[in-house]
Amino acid sequence: MNIKGLNHLLFSVSNLEQSIDFYQQVFDAKLLVKGRSTAYFDLNGIWLALNEEKHIPRNEINESYTHTAFSIDESELESAIQHLKALNVNILEGRERAEQDKQSIYFTDPDGHKFEFHTGTLQERLKYYRDQKKHMTFY
């Protein structure tokens, strides 16, 4: 099997209308279609889907570091932070990082899904780890 790439991201949400507003305002996602319990967006070429599932437990999501990270230019980090603050988005306390690890801001959607705007690349991270993390094995 040959994986061609990422097909889509789908998030379960408790309130479709509230989540549509969030994804449009925070990510500038273009709404493509909306049904009774589903919405599809184009997020800079990424297919983003929301499914409304009102009655599922959501508390455990707060305990996990699982998140979706989007790349942004370092020069845009401060304006991204101000944009999130202006929208009253729940911004999370970031973790301590070395300068080589670049910069990030973490935040959640109304259902607690975690997101990150990150200024680094995989190549930069691997170089940093090769240089500084001698306990790691590279393939």
From Swiss-Prot:
Residue span(s) of domain VOC: 5-120
Enzyme class per UniProt: transferase
GO biological process assignments: response to antibiotic
Domain of life, source organism: Bacteria
Active site annotation, chain numbering: 116 (proton donor/acceptor)
Keywords: Antibiotic resistance, Cytoplasm, Magnesium, Metal-binding, Transferase
Places the protein is found: Cytoplasm
UniProt-annotated binding residues for Mg(2+): 8, 67, 116
EC number assigned by the record: 2.5.1.-
GO CC terms in record: cytoplasm
GO molecular function: magnesium ion binding; transferase activity, transferring alkyl or aryl (other than methyl) groups
Cofactor: Mg(2+)
Family: Belongs to the fosfomycin resistance protein family. FosB subfamily.
Annotated PANTHER family: FOSFOMYCIN RESISTANCE PROTEIN FOSX, LYASE, PUTATIVE-RELATED-RELATED
Assembly and oligomerization: Homodimer.
The protein's role, per its UniProt record: Metallothiol transferase which confers resistance to fosfomycin by catalyzing the addition of a thiol cofactor to fosfomycin. L-cysteine is probably the physiological thiol donor.
Protein name stated in the entry: Metallothiol transferase FosB
